[in-house]
Swiss-Prot record:
Residues 213-243 are annotated as: Disordered. Disulfide bonds: none annotated. The N-terminus is involved in binding to the fiber protein p37. The C-terminus contains glycine-rich motifs (GRM) and mediates the host specificity. The glycine-rich motifs assemble into a 3-layered PG(II) sandwich domain. A motif (GRM 9) lies at residues 219-224. This phage use outer membrane protein ompA as a receptor. It holds the Pfam family Gp38_N. A motif (GRM 4) lies at residues 164-177. This is Receptor-recognizing protein gp38.
Length: 259
């Protein structure tokens, strides 16, 4: 809730918890000297802290922003976060986000877009890695990255001994880091699933021919080695930060494209 008039002093006390106006002004991020009338419409920061979650739905961030209204909001990230889907950015701020600003503090941990899937039998199933942060509010998003921001790795390229890509001929591509799925769909040699810490391996015939492994964070998947047979290309990684440029207070470690 913002400070309102006409009784600015009492409203400032209720909103900030400070009985002295100097303290209230500090909570409202106002320098001294100041006019009390300038407190009207200002709000204290709304602060949230999140620990590790490897299946996180970024809608949670958006919901908290709208709950706070126009008040500035702070997200402190203290554990690794991974989006639940490569189709949904981990952290998305669309243009209708109402807050004065959104402060994102990453405390020595990593925020991840989810990894893409490897190619499967019937030449289906591959997908790009997921975007980590989608920013459509420009500099109102302030990022203090004391850890890492990573786009999901791309899926690995597939390999088939026959052009019809029937399962009995196919090596599936590996999943991109983190948690991308290896290509299967009945593949004789399915690709491996990625974990938080490593991409999945491509399926291997046991000879010198094999499918491509999944990509590391912010990297495309790997190419298959088909010899004279058939292959599909690996997929692309997700961006670390897409959309419009935020206010970078500390860039930190970045894996994948950023604005």
């Amino acid at each position: 809730m913002a400070v309102t008039g006409p009784w600015v002093g009492s409203s400032a006390v209720v909103n900030t918890g400070q009985n002295w106006m100097v303290g209230a002004a500090q909570r409202l991020r106002m320098g001294a000297p100041f006019w009390m009338s300038n407190m009207i419409g200002r709000s204290v920061e709304v602060i949230h802290t999140l620990g590790a979650d490897h299946n996180f739905n970024g809608q949670w961030f958006r919901d908290r922003c709208f709950e706070a209204g126009s008040a500035p909001i702070v997200f402190n990230i203290t554990g690794d976060l991974v989006s639940y889907s490569r189709d949904v950015p981990l952290f998305f701020m669309y243009g209708d986000t109402p807050n004065e600003y959104v402060q994102l503090n990453i405390h020595g941990v990593t925020m991840y877009g989810r990894g893409g899937n490897g190619w499967a039998a019937c030449a289906i199933g591959a997908s790009d890695g997921g975007v980590c942060i989608q920013n459509d509010i420009g500099g109102r998003l302030r990022i203090n990255n004391g850890g890492a921001i990573a786009g999901g790795g791309g899926g690995g390229g597939g390999y088939s001994q026959a052009n019809n890509w029937a399962g009995k001929y196919v090596c599936g591509g590996g999943g991109g880091r983190p948690f991308g799925l290896g290509g299967n769909n009945g593949a004789r040699w399915p690709g491996g699933n990625a974990s938080l810490t490593s991409p999945g391996a491509g399926g291997n015939t046991g000879t010198r021919y094999y499918a491509g492994g999944g990509g590391e964070v912010g990297q495309p998947g790997q190419y298959a080695n088909p010899g004279a047979s058939y292959s599909t290309p690996p997929t692309s990684p997700g961006a670390a930060v897409a959309g419009s440029a935020p206010t970078w207070q500390n860039v930190g470690a970045i894996y994948g494209p950023r604005v």
